[in-house]
């Protein structure tokens, strides 16, 4: 997936008025790989970045998060660039805002021949998202072919629709994604996206069942976020085990104090994948780790999560326990 440079005015300052920006790194697939690494699994990011000081900044952040940089390729061209986006926080009644500057980034010119065939070996799970497929024709071709090659070598395929209207239309997304769904094992799609992109009808459970009936997907996950204000959210999700034909749900995390919601969906995916891939994993575990990881990420500035497995398990314990909770970890 694409690695992005994020620039944000501090606190609640506005892009149109602020004079300084905080520099951070993110991107859907990197956010997920970072979350999985924090929870205890080995992860790496496949991407293309500029061979420059900005690219080195991104590489250093990747390493700091415990994510392998062995699968990066470097763009040495004069027009090499890292995609950029600007983000400002919201406060009721003003919504958060995003401005993208990612066209013609190094990632948009990715080519599958830049990667050695050894990357397809010994991988338990390959994850990508609709954002990556929407970036360019080169990204789409490379992403689809990698899905097929990883699947052929025995990896589970995880896919997050992550629909972005500013990147492609619902019809473009539907045509492309329906072509890869026969290869997908773990599918992340919100109820709203299922209706907008795939024309699905019915409630969320009926929508999930319809995907499982049409494609050989094993696990389908759908987040459910209630935005009370830019700073206060409720969050939970539904996971469907298509083989057992069983739904998994839990009570929502309520009144989450949102510091930064960017990346919370990716944190959810990382928790779900950890819950499925851990030694005693399954959908029940995926639900607990996914919901807790997403809820917790909302409280962390920047795109990437910053809580390890012990901290997430403490959050899960408090969420499931009635009665006294310590107000501080000490």
Task: List where the protein language model places each region.
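Conserved N-terminal subdomain of the carbohydrate kinase-like
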Residues: 42-130, 312-330
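Histidine-anchored nucleotide/phosphate-binding helix
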Residues: 28-38, 142-149
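A short helix->loop->beta-strand "cap" motif at the edges of active sites that frequently abuts
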Residues: 150-156, 215-218
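Conserved post-catalytic alpha-helical subdomain immediately downstream of the catalytic base
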Residues: 252-319, 323-330
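Short catalytic helix/loop segments, enriched in acidic residues and glycine
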Residues: 14-34
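Conserved phosphate/ATP/ADP-binding segment of small-molecule kinases
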Residues: 167-244
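Alpha-helix C-terminal capping segments
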Residues: 31-43, 64, 275-279
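Positively charged, low-complexity intrinsically disordered leader regions
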Residues: 1-14
């Amino acid at each position: 997936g694409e690695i992005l440079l994020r620039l944000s005015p501090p606190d609640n300052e506005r892009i149109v008025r602020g004079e300084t920006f905080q520099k951070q790194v993110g991107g859907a697939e990197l956010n997920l790989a970072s979350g999985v690494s924090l929870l205890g699994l080995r992860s790496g990011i496949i991407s293309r970045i500029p061979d420059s000081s900005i690219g080195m900044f991104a590489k250093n952040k990747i390493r700091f998060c415990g994510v392998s940089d062995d699968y990066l390729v470097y763009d040495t061209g004069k027009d090499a660039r890292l995609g950029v986006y600007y983000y400002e926080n919201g406060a009721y009644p003003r919504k958060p805002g995003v401005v993208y500057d990612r066209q013609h980034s190094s990632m948009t010119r990715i080519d599958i021949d830049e990667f050695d065939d050894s990357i397809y070996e010994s991988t338990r799970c390959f994850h990508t998202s609709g954002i990556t497929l929407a970036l360019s024709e080169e990204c789409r071709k490379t992403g689809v072919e990698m899905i097929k090659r990883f699947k052929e070598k025995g990896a589970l395929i995880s896919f997050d629709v992550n629909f972005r209207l500013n990147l492609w239309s619902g019809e473009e997304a539907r045509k492309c994604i329906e072509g890869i769904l026969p290869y997908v094992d773990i599918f992340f799609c919100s109820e709203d996206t299922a209706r907008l992109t795939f024309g699905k009808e019915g409630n969320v459970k009926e929508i999930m069942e319809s995907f499982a009936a049409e494609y050989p997907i094993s696990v389908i996950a759908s987040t459910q976020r209630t935005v009370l204000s830019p700073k206060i959210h409720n969050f939970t999700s539904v996971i469907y085990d298509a083989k057992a034909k069983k739904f998994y749900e839990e009570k929502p995390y309520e009144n989450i104090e949102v510091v930064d919601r960017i990346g919370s969906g990716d944190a959810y995916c990382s928790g779900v994948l950890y819950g499925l891939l851990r030694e005693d994993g399954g959908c029940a575990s995926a639900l607990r780790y996914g919901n807790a990881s997403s809820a917790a990420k909302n409280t962390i500035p920047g795109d990437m999560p910053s809580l390890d497995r012990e901290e997430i398990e403490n959050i899960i314990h408090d969420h499931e326990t009635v009665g006294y909770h310590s107000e501080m970890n000490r």
